[in-house]
Amino acid sequence: MNKNMKITGAGWTTSPLFIPAQKDAAIGFIGSLNYVPSIDTNENKMFKDSYLKNFGRVPSEFAVQGYDAGKVIIEAVKSLSGNITDKSQLTEAINNISVVGPRGPLTIDRNSNNVIQNIYIFEVIKGDTMPSLKILDTIEAVKDPGTGCSL
């Protein structure tokens, strides 16, 4: 990094998966992701603590995507009282689910079948033992333009 110029790019460049290898070289990077471990909510604290206990490392954006996908599916199945034989009913149930997970609120966009979610702008800063991701701004309820999947 350069003291006079910040480096920016895709958030996964400094994902929690890569920070242990990058160490202090990542400090100063600015990026955006749908999840950073420093989100200050009870849902994220519980998720992060449990993940760290079970896997010995800080969760990444990929870990939270799997967790939230499972949460959406569970809620959709519950809403159908476990009867998931009709795929169109299950799809409709998923489209009607709104959950709050470690990364914040999310729903499925009926037009694109993509997730409507917060995006976090962050900077990598020096942490106690490892660099961490400090949230600079939150862009709420980001929606895909609708040019994607047409399931």
Regions found by a protein language model. Name each.
Residues 1-151:
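Extracytosolic ligand-binding ectodomains
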